[in-house]
Each structure stands twice: as structure tokens, then as C-alpha cells.
A protein has these predicted regions:
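Conserved beta-strand positions in the central sheet of alpha/beta enzyme cores
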Residues: 36, 69-71, 121, 157, ...
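Active-site acidic/histidine proton-transfer and metal-coordination neighborhood
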Residues: 19-21, 25-29, 62, 78-186, ...
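Short, solvent-exposed loop/turn segments at secondary-structure boundaries
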Residues: 45-50, 96, 131-136, 197-199, ...
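Alpha-helix-loop-beta-strand connector modules within alpha/beta enzyme cores
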Residues: 53-70, 139-149, 239-242
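Short glycine-enriched loops at secondary-structure junctions
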Residues: 72-76
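Histidine-acidic metal/acid-base catalytic patches
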Residues: 2-9, 17-33, 57-64, 78-79, ...
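Glycine-rich, proline-tolerant flexible connector loops at the mouths of alpha/beta enzymes
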Residues: 37-60, 125-130
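Short, contiguous alpha-helical
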Residues: 14
């Protein structure tokens, strides 16, 4: 009898700090077999030389772990003359000249291949001064990037990031409809969708056919409008409604824990893993 297909639980080692072994060892302890690589050794993974990426891959291999995704910072950028606000890109420059961008795309895809990651996250240009904000739809670099990715056996997934130009459902659907046939999918951050007021059942059902990866983090809203991050399932993001809808559309999605909890990230990851295992229908591998 064939075993039923299940969704996958993923952990990002840099949630515990720059030493990737700490997060990898926690993944093993929690029974998590897949990793998301974003940064390591204090540097963005896309900027690391081949030998350091190979070392990270060997650390994962030694523990029986596979790299499910490279959480790259591609397109979380603007022109050099623009002035972005404070943006967390994990050591990657936010101001990137047009002539350097394809090189970064190619470098990220090579990094994914070295790590054994089948998926690479991208963004959609930072929102800066109106006259300098670039449009993602129609960006000539995107078809080039999709072609390079397809040749390399890697899939590009667009994250809905509020500081970027494509975060709401309408532009997301426009971009995905236009480029889905070329391989583009959705890296859905449910908390980001909730932040822009659109983590509803109707919106999730529209987006679900395009989803290839799910980011899971949670937060509590404070009276002053700020947010306090907390373990998944303990905040205001409506996972109890959203996760069953995503599972119904695709029963084998990867769910990646991204806590942003600074005081006790290991405890938050432990609690988040337990929450997802009890909430995603069909269980998690």
C-alpha cells in the first residue's frame, strides 16, 4: 500500500543565530527533516562563496536534513538613487544597479543548486519614492530569471511582502496569472497577508492554486499599532481558518516556521511546530 502524501514542516536555522548547526540540531530534535536557508555565518546565503555553501550542505547531509528552499532577497531592492526605509535583508544590499541584478539572480540560483534547494524565494521591488518605485509586472528581468531557473531545475516563488510593491491579493493574482505558465508560484506569508487585512477565506481560496510554499509566523497587535511576535498559533493571524483551506487546495504543501521571536526562539519554534502538527489536516512530515 502506498503511504499517504503529507505536507512538510520546515525550519530556518538562522532563527537561532548565525551558527547554522544550532538550528539544524534543533530541527533533528523536533523531528523536522527539511530546512530553509536564508543566512548563515552572519551573511546572506546568496553572498556566500561556493565552499561555504558546500559546507552548509554537508552539515545538513550529516544530520539527514534536506534543504527545501533558499529564502533569497532577490527583488527586495531599489535603484541606487532611491532611498529605502529600514528593511531587513539579512546582509544583502537594498540598492542594486540594473546592470548587476541578473548576476545576483544567477548567483542565487547557483547557490540553490549547491544547497540542493528546489525553490528560491523572490520579492517584487521595494516601495520607495513614488517616482523611483519600480513595477514588478513587466520587469524584463523576471522572464529572464524564470528562464534561468527553469533551466536549472529551480522554481521561483514570489513572497507577498508589505514593504514591496506586490503584497495585496489583486496585484498578486495579476502577476501570478501572467507568469504562472513560465513557472512562477506564490511563497505565501500568511501573517503578511493578515497585516494588509486580506487573510480571509475568500482571498486564500483565490490564491491557493498558486501557492508553492507557506511561511508561518504570528504576532500580537498592540494598542500603539506595533506588533509583538509570538509562537505560531498564539497571536492574531487566523491560521485555524487559513490552514485547512490551503490543505484542501494542496495536501502536500511545505510549511516553514519563521518566528521572529528574539527572546526564546527555540521555545517558539518548538511551540510552533506542535501547533502546525496539530492544525494542518493530514499531519506534517
Amino acid at each position: 500500500m502506498t503511504a499517504p502524501l503529507t505536507s512538510t514542516l520546515i525550519l530556518n536555522p538562522d532563527e537561532l543565530g548565525p551558527d547554522p548547526t544550532l538550528g539544524m540540531d534543533l530541527a533533528v530534535k523536533l523531528g523536522i527533516g527539511h530546512l530553509e536557508i536564508r543566512s548563515a555565518e552572519g551573511a546572506n546565503a546568496v553572498t556566500l562563496p561556493r565552499e561555504r555553501l558546500e559546507h552548509i550542505r554537508s552539515l545538513a547531509d550529516e544530520r539527514g536534513l534536506k534543504v527545501a528552499a533558499l529564502a533569497s532577497p532577490l527583488w527586495k531592492w531599489c535603484r541606487p538613487e532611491a532611498r529605502p526605509g529600514r528593511v531587513d535583508t539579512f546582509g544583502f544590499p537594498t540598492q542594486v544597479a540594473l546592470e548587476h541584478r541578473l548576476g545576483w539572480v544567477e548567483r542565487a540560483i547557483r547557490a540553490a543548486a549547491i544547497l540542493g534547494a528546489p525553490t528560491v524565494r523572490i520579492f517584487s521591488h521595494l516601495r520607495v519614492e513614488p517616482e523611483l518605485t519600480e513595477q514588478f509586472t513587466g520587469d524584463p528581468l523576471l522572464p529572464q530569471a524564470l528562464e534561468v531557473a527553469n533551466r536549472s531545475g529551480v522554481r521561483l516563488l514570489l513572497e507577498n511582502e508589505p514593504v514591496c510593491t506586490v503584497a495585496h491579493a489583486e496585484p498578486l493574482l495579476e502577476v501570478l496569472h501572467r507568469y504562472h505558465g513560465q513557472g512562477l508560484g506564490l511563497w505565501l506569508d500568511v501573517a503578511n497577508l493578515h497585516e494588509v487585512g486580506q487573510a480571509t477565506g475568500e482571498v486564500v481560496e483565490y490564491l491557493a492554486p498558486y501557492v508553492g510554499y507557506v511561511h508561518v509566523k504570528d504576532y500580537e497587535s498592540n494598542a500603539d499599532g506595533s506588533r509583538t511576535f509570538c509562537p505560531a498559533g498564539e497571536g492574531c493571524v487566523p491560521y485555524d481558518e487559513v490552514l485547512p483551506l490551503l490543505h484542501a487546495a494542496c495536501p502536500t504543501l511545505p510549511y516553514a516556521l519563521e518566528t521572529h521571536v528574539r527572546d526564546s526562539p527555540a521555545d517558539a519554534l518548538h511551540a510552533g511546530a506542535a501547533f502546525l502538527r496539530s492544525t494542518v489536516p493530514g499531519g506534517l512530515a
